[in-house]
């Protein structure tokens, strides 16, 4: 097996399991532990995984955000409920921003009947999903493509966002601590902040597992959003700081509480 094929196969293992040991990878691919370490070093340098004691992980940490393919497999039912609720906030004729996240990306499958509609996004999955949808005008934000996030970021993206004004922005973040949102990646933070500035109304969509976490970069206070949408699974402990601060928290279950 060629080194590049083996590294892709290592990523496939991590996408499925989240973590893997050097010993297991060595046995699986029939190579030395030293070779596995070199593969993991290269993949870590590319920002695709993080090395941990005895192996590697693709799971999030305060400094590392998971690959989008792994995140898409997590809390899928909850994310779908949140996305369906968010779609109910959109009216025909509006313009909306959708960020790069897997939670907001799920909105794309819920808005095909809301027409006409302008969707502006740096999320390649959303662009691909809606590119042929009748009555939906898709504006793709350019920039440097990130394989890890499956989205576009950087100077070109930021300049485009600075020139836009939209009705609604739907964003997510990888960590909520107290009444603030955080993220691991600096360029992602910059794009999200500009999306907040570009919108009349803004909603943060996060599954309940994002609460009680922190990450390297402060994104914004939650009071920047008209509401925070999450699953009914969110604990009272994590909901309390938002409610005490007067931040609108919508717990979405099958009854779809109104925002």
Regions from the PLM with identified roles:
Residues 2-23, 27-97, 101, 108-116, ...:
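HTH-adjacent hinge/linker in prokaryotic transcriptional regulators
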């Amino acid at each position: 097996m060629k080194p590049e094929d083996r590294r892709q196969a290592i990523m496939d293992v991590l996408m499925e399991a989240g973590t893997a040991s050097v010993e297991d990878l060595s046995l699986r691919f029939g190579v030395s532990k030293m070779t596995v370490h070199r593969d993991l070093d290269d993949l870590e340098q590319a920002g695709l995984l993080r090395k941990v004691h005895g192996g590697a992980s693709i799971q999030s940490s305060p400094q590392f955000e998971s690959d989008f393919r792994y995140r898409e497999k997590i809390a899928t039912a909850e994310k779908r409920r949140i996305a369906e609720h968010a779609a109910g906030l959109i009216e025909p004729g509006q313009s909306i921003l959708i960020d790069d996240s897997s939670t907001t990306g799920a909105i794309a499958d819920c808005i095909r009947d809301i027409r006409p509609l302008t969707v502006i996004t740096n999320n390649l999955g959303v662009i691909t999903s809606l590119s042929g949808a009748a009555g939906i005008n898709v504006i793709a934000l350019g920039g440097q493509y990130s394989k890890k996030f499956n989205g576009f970021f950087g100077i070109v993206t930021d300049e485009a966002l600075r020139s836009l004004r939209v009705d609604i922005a739907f964003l997510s973040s990888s960590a909520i601590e107290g009444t603030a949102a955080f993220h691991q990646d600096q360029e992602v933070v910059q794009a999200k902040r500009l999306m907040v500035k570009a919108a009349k109304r803004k909603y943060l969509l996060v599954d309940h597992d994002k609460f009680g976490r922190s990450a390297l970069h402060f994104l914004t206070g939650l009071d920047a959003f008209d509401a925070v949408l999450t699953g009914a699974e969110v604990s009272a402990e994590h909901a309390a700081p938002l409610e005490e601060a007067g931040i609108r928290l919508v717990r979405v279950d099958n009854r779809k509480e109104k925002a």
